[in-house]
């Protein structure tokens, strides 16, 4: 059975294809806002290269952020379209932060965090906990932190390890306190998004991670 993961990251989108327990590929393409129109072509080209088509994939996992609202919604909408009217095809949304923090390989019971550039000299924090079998699950704790709040927040968590994307490292470290233990990674562990067990395949792709409340405007 084919399974697939689509996870939008700050400077790229990752596509992972598996067949049963075999990882066939982990492909990444630089992609930001205006490049999002390339996503369907990227997915189709990768599937074709491995002798598959969207209809062959029976389990879809979508990275749900945090990230660009436009990118998250596009990935969810595209996946929902490929699943529409197919009772044997299941999908789910799993926070991409799980894949990023999973790069730290937290031990069972260990708390860790993924941190993102929140712009405006702030970082977005997403907490996770290590589980048996190299699994990771969210703790439910999220925060928007400027330098002052970050100093107090991480001061209460001495030694907690943090993961960040390399493309955001400069901006993130400018906000983190000097004692924070952060590691940067070019990519996240998207295979973990497929194999994590905390989130069932419920066909609900409408739960993007909004750590910072969405801003609405009116005319």
Model feature map: region roles:
Residues 38-41, 77, 99:
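Short amphipathic alpha-helical face segments that pack within enzyme cores
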Residues 1-66:
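N-terminal beta-alpha supersecondary unit
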Residues 50, 86-87, 176:
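A broad structural signal for alpha-helix termini and local helix breaks/kinks
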Residues 59-90:
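DPxDG-like acidic metal-binding loop motif
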Residues 1-20, 32-36, 91-219:
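Oxyanion-binding and handling regions
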Residues 44, 80, 173:
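Short glycine-/small-residue-rich flexible loop motifs, especially phosphate/cofactor-binding loops
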């Amino acid at each position: 059975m084919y399974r697939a993961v689509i996870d939008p990251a700050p400077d790229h989108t990752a596509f992972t294809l598996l067949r049963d327990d075999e990882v066939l590929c982990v492909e990444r393409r630089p992609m930001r806002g205006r490049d999002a129109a390339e996503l369907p072509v990227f997915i189709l080209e990768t599937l074709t290269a491995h002798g598959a088509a969207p209809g062959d994939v029976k389990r879809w996992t979508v990275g749900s952020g945090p990230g660009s609202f436009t990118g998250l919604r596009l990935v969810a909408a595209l996946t929902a379209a490929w699943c529409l009217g197919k009772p044997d095809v299941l999908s789910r949304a799993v926070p991409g932060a799980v894949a990023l923090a999973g790069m730290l390989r937290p031990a069972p019971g260990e708390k860790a965090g993924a941190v993102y550039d929140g712009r405006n000299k702030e970082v977005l924090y997403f907490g996770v906990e290590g589980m048996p079998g190299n699994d990771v699950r969210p703790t439910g704790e999220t925060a928007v932190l400027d330098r002052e709040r970050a100093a107090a927040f991480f001061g209460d968590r001495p030694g907690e390890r943090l993961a960040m994307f390399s493309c955001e490292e400069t901006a993130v470290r400018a906000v983190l306190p000097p004692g924070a233990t952060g590691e940067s990674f070019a990519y996240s562990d998207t295979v973990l998004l497929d194999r994590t067990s905390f989130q069932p395949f419920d066909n609900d792709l409408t739960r993007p991670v909004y750590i910072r409340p969405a801003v609405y405007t009116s005319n």
